[in-house]
Amino acid sequence: MRVAILLSMILLFTPGTVADASPMENSYEGNPIVVINLTYESGIGGGDEFQGEIVLELFLNWAPITVTNFVDLVNQSFYDGIYFHRIIDDFVIQSGDPDCKASGVYPVPISDASCGEGGSSETIPFEANANLTHINGAIGMARGLDPDSATSQFYICDGPQHGLDNGNRTQEDDPGYAVFGVVREGIELVQAAAAVPTTNDPDGDGSSPRAPGGPDRPLYEVHINSITIREYVPAPVVENTDVEGLSGLSLSVSALSIILTAIALSRKMNS
């Protein structure tokens, strides 16, 4: 019986083992936090209007080239005023072409053929990291057939899209797409944007299947007002431990103390 009591105390006071979390679930010191401020002004058959902020953490620790490129463009106000030119519900929302800017009235998609083909002047090399995958809300770099052709265009996943991951592509020479961040706040805005009516899905988030091919251009503008750097993830604050917040070492010492006390009491009772 005394052994059972001692084992119970060991289980009670010894900290359990916690599995390592995915790097995309945790924040890391020095990673930039960016904010996409967007607005959707609807029209007839366009669904509900919305506006707000999508907050993302960019993984500088895992994708330094890609993140540095994106942050440099943000600091130049490169993305301000651009609209999301390609939207596929339950897949991605895509933006980042400086030619996709409405001058006055939002352009009629059929006369807007060049939008979606442009980008910034410099390409960056393909950068993949096994820790970064296309989970819901992942942000990645759009590119052409050449893996090293990404410039400024990006997409945000509406739901997990692991078919885009490095190693999951069907073509032998296709390395996939480079993820470099994830949505921390505002995933509901990603979902709302993904559900707007487009040239290939006039009903938006409706029952009609999406027509293949075409630009998947929103019928009404999903406008990026600005993308800004809010902050960089600070170093974790080290607090003094107290009774309600003991460290693993403190718990182990406490457990040992209780066990020794129990043994001493047991010997005294038997003497």
What do these predicted regions represent?
Residues 16-245:
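Cyclophilin-like peptidyl-prolyl cis-trans isomerases
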Residues 1-23, 238-271:
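Secretory targeting signatures
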